[in-house]
A protein has these predicted regions:
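Soluble catalytic domains of enzymes that build or remodel membrane lipids, polysaccharides, and related
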Residues: 193-404
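Membrane-embedded alpha-helical bundles of multi-pass enzymes
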Residues: 1-191, 388-391, 398-404
Length: 404
């Protein structure tokens, strides 16, 4: 239960202090409690945290993957257990080798937890989701994103919760520290960020909320195209640049149909599009002002590519979803439009903070296109937006985000 309590710290709930309670409980149970059920405590906490926190995955599997409820739950459990094991094993190893003294607890627990966090960034393509450092958004600590990043704030939280366990017998210090943190986390951010003295650019974000089922149904294609053209024409009266979401239409940017559509747009257009290059299918961003394309570098497993494809492809309908044979892009791109340069990012790309940091060095702003309708009204789109906002603050650069 206490693992699931920690999920309340993230969007859409944003009760920040819940994660402090959750992690303090975990570390206390593992390293200070006389309870011999360490394995059970760790597994149940991990399942509550990852199972509830990433429950949005089941929405895309069940509703849009055309998989039975039982099959959806089974796949979701397999994916959740993968997250759990990656978190579970290093903590269990630490429990086996640590000497049960306060100074060791303070030294080793935060260190191991932050190593696990780094590992999740890189292992099997990476899944840096539900990081403790995310909870400091919209608090006075938000200013630290630009100084020490998400990982630095995660480390500070790990040190704090380990200190809670060390100070457990000293109730006065424990209460004072936690009261201060609770009040400060509940306080609004008073520091300005992303203030720019540059030229003002008017961008219009076109988000028609297209049903994913209809997008791949030819009976609806003309209506979807007309909606994009109509909304863009209305927005073009005041906007300098138009931004469409990720892959808003089911054909490639090279097709005659897409070229004709783009010609009907009155202003510079930045949009997600499928693209076909050198025999490979990509999830891309196109710029109507330039020939170059940006190809998404962080593909979503089981959605845009199928791991172990020779074994899994065709096993169930979920593994044959449209456009699930994408190729990964191999380099960042900086794009230019009449009002400056921007770093393009597609959907899951925005989650990888270190990659984004390297991309934005000479850009005026970020543009992130996404298609979060695959996850309905679950936690996923809210958590995704939360992470996107943090990327902007970390790099002190404005972000434009269009999602369907």
């Amino acid at each position: 239960m206490f693992g699931s309590i920690g999920v309340l710290s993230f969007a859409p709930f944003s009760f920040k202090y819940a994660l402090v309670v959750s992690y303090t409980y975990l570390i206390y149970k593992l390293f200070r409690s006389n309870d011999n059920r360490n394995l059970n405590n760790l597994f149940l906490w991990s399942f509550g945290y990852w199972g509830i926190g990433t429950s949005w995955i089941i929405v895309s599997i069940y509703y849009y993957g055309n998989v039975s409820l039982l099959g959806s739950i089974t796949l979701f459990l397999i994916l959740s257990i993968g997250c759990i094991i990656f978190f579970f094993l290093p903590i269990l190893l630490l429990k086996r080798v640590i000497i049960n003294k306060s100074n060791n607890l303070l030294l080793f627990v935060p260190f191991i937890l932050i190593l696990v966090e780094f590992g999740r960034y890189y292992f099997l393509g990476g899944f840096p989701w539900l990081l403790p450092g995310y909870i400091f958004l919209d608090t006075p600590y938000e200013i630290l994103y630009g100084l020490i990043g998400v990982s630095g704030l995660s480390l500070l939280l790990y040190i704090f919760v380990a200190s809670n366990v060390v100070l457990y017998s000293n109730k006065t210090y424990l209460l004072a520290l936690n009261l201060f943190l609770f009040i400060s986390l509940m306080s609004p951010n008073i520091f300005e960020s992303n203030k720019s003295d540059g030229d003002i650019v008017n961008l219009a974000i076109i988000q028609p909320s297209t049903d994913p089922f209809k997008k791949f149904d030819n009976d609806y294609l003309n209506d979807i195209e007309q909606e994009f053209v109509s909304l863009s024409s209305q927005a073009a009266e005041k906007a300098d640049i138009l931004v469409w979401p990720e892959a808003p239409l089911p054909y490639t940017s090279e097709s005659a149909r897409s070229q004709n559509l783009i010609k009907n747009i009155e202003k510079p257009l930045i949009s997600g599009f499928f693209s076909y290059q050198d025999g490979n299918l990509y999830n891309s961003i196109i710029n109507s002002e330039q020939e170059i394309k940006y190809n998404k570098r962080k593909l979503v497993p089981f959605g845009e590519y199928i791991p172990f494809e020779s074994f899994l492809r065709g096993l169930i309908s979920f593994f044959d979803m449209p456009m699930s044979n994408m190729t990964r892009g191999d380099s960042p791109k900086q794009m230019n439009v009449g009002y400056g340069s921007f770093s393009p990012l597609v959907c899951f790309d925005i989650v990888f903070g270190e990659m984004v940091r390297k991309d934005v060095k000479s850009s005026n702003y970020l543009i992130n296109v996404s298609n979060d309708t695959w996850f309905g009204n679950s936690f996923g789109p809210y958590q995704h937006l939360e992470i996107s906002r943090i990327r902007s603050i970390e790099n002190n650069i404005p972000i434009v985000r269009a999602t369907n």
